[in-house]
Amino acid sequence: MPGFTCCVPGCYSNSHRDKGLHFYTFPKDPELRCLWLKNVSRGGVSGCFSTFQPTNGHRVCSLHFQGGRKSYSIKVPTIFPLRGVNEKRTRRSSTKKRQQPNYTPAATTVLVTGLPGQEEQEVLELTAGGAEMMLLSTTAGMGATITNVEGSSAVIGATIDAMGTAAVERGSVAAPSNLAVKLDVGEAHAISTHFSSDASHGSHQQLQVVVVGDEPFPSVDCWPSLLGSDHSYSMSSGTTTEELLRKLNEQRDIIALMEVKMKEMKSSIKHLKVTEVKLREELRQKDKDKVSPMIKSN
């Protein structure tokens, strides 16, 4: 971003963006300059500001002066409400131990096919945890029963009854269905799930769900740990809008300072080129002056 950026740590005012602000250079008077440096490089700020030597490109915006403007009576910036960019901050993540993902084998491929009389069939990707969630989130008014569930390393028996009244509140009756679920893990194990309700409410629909294959997948409680990152500008679950804006402003401030430095370097290069041309011309003139007397003497 072009223009001047306030050099006060934690302030991101820019002359190009903030048209209503004034930007002041550091005074030449030694005493005033010392006071400015002492206030700008205030306690708790480390890094370049500990040995900060301002140049003409460093400006202080009017937000840091009483009354919002520098005057004859107000010559020293004293308002610093923002936190320093380089202040030492304790990282919240350093005190927290990251959870290691617990991977559990789970069947993922689910084939849903219609029984005779139904043409549609569909292939879904589902985990064992997802299948359980699907069973628990069935249409309100249905009863779900899971029996005789066996695995390669454990024997599980459970009964889940999910009852609700949402369908009654909507004034509609859920269509009853029978759902058969089969699990193929290399052994002859099966999960039999039956959803049913009163047969007098309507016709029955039947679906067959076949789950095949094994694939390790992290449990749901480990997902937040997978989203964490050690990068200082990464977005964690606890990142607030103010923190994100502060980080973006820091990046914007760095870019603005780099642009100012690039302009200064370009100006210096241009000045050096002009000086080089002048020196070459002077050398050429001196050589010419030396040769002229020799020619006249001959």
Curated annotation (Swiss-Prot):
SUPFAM superfamilies: Glucocorticoid receptor-like (DNA-binding domain). A zinc finger (THAP-type) spans 6-64. Keywords: Coiled coil, DNA-binding, Metal-binding, Nucleus, Repressor, Transcription, Transcription regulation, Zinc, Zinc-finger. One of its GO terms (molecular function) is DNA binding. Residues 242-283 form a coiled coil. One of its GO terms (cellular component) is nucleoplasm. GO terms for biological process: regulation of transcription by RNA polymerase II. It is found in: Nucleus. It comes from the Eukaryota. Pfam families: THAP (PF05485). SMART domains: DM3, THAP. Its main location: nucleus. Transcriptional repressor that plays a central role for embryogenesis and the pluripotency of embryonic stem (ES) cells. Sequence-specific DNA-binding factor that represses gene expression in pluripotent ES cells by directly binding to key genetic loci and recruiting epigenetic modifiers. Belongs to the THAP11 family. This is THAP domain-containing protein 11.
